[in-house]
C-alpha cells in the first residue's frame, strides 16, 4: 500500500513533510484491515504493451471517516483556543494522522464498495512480460475509498452539523475554557476582587445555562444561514432584581449611615446576589 499511497497525499495542505513514526503508520493497517477486491475484467492492447484492469474495491466507509475527521479537527481547534495555549504543530502531518488513528481505533465503520480501472504497462516483452501498475492520484484515491476527495470537499459536513460541533464543544467546556474561548479571561483577572467575583458569577451562570437548538438551514452558493435558538442566563431578570434590591437599600437608613464606600461595596454585593440567584 505504501508504494501507491503517499502519506502527504491525504493531507496536501499540511504544514510539513515530516516522516511519520512507526506508531502512526498503523493508521494504514487499521484502514485496510477489511480491504478486499474482485477483478471484474482485464483488457490488453494488441501490442501487449498496455493493459487495463477493472476492479471492485471494498474499503471502509471513507466518507463517514472523513466527516468524523473534519468534525473532530474543528473540535480540537476550538479546544486548543480555549486552552489559551498556542500549538505550533496543530496543522502538522503527525497531528492529523494521530487524529485519524484515534478515530479508526475508537470507532467502527461499515464497508463501502467502488469500481475502478487500473492501468498497467508491460516493461518486458510479449514473450517475457513484466507488468507494472501505473501510479496515479486517482489510483491513490480509489485505494482509500475516495478519502482524499472527501477530505478536500468543503461541503462534506453540512452547515448545521458544523455549527452543532461548535456549540456542543462550547457547551461541554469547563468555566475556565469557556472564559478563554469567549475572550473573557482578562475580565476575570481584574485586581478588583468585587468585580472579579461578579465576572466569575456571570461566567458560572452562562456555563450552567447555555444550551442550543438548531431549527433550520438555508444554503445559497458559498453562503449558508443557520437559525438556532440559544439559551443563556436571563440578564433582564438579574437587572430587575438588582435594581429592586438596590433601591430598597438606598431608601433605608443603613445607606445613609454606611457612607459612599460602603454603599459602593453594597451595590456590588447586591448585584452578585442577583446573579447567583438568577432563575431561567
Question: What kind of region is each of these model predictions?
Answer:
Residues 1-34, 38, 143-213, 237:
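Core segments of small alpha/beta cavity-forming domains
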Residues 38-47:
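Long amphipathic N-terminal alpha/beta scaffold segment
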Residues 40-41, 104-107, 215:
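Beta-strand-rich interaction surfaces with strong enrichment in secreted/lumenal proteins
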Residues 47-59, 222-232:
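A short hydrophobic beta-strand element
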Residues 58-76, 231-250:
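Short, cysteine-centered beta-strand-loop-beta hairpins and adjacent loop/turn segments enriched
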Residues 64, 73-98, 102-152, 248-280:
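Short beta-strand edge/turn micro-motifs at domain boundaries
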Residues 173-174, 221, 234, 246:
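Charged, low-complexity helical/coil segments in non-catalytic cytosolic or luminal regions
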Residues 209-216, 220, 231-233:
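Extracytoplasmic/luminal low-complexity segments enriched in Pro/Gly and acidic/polar residues
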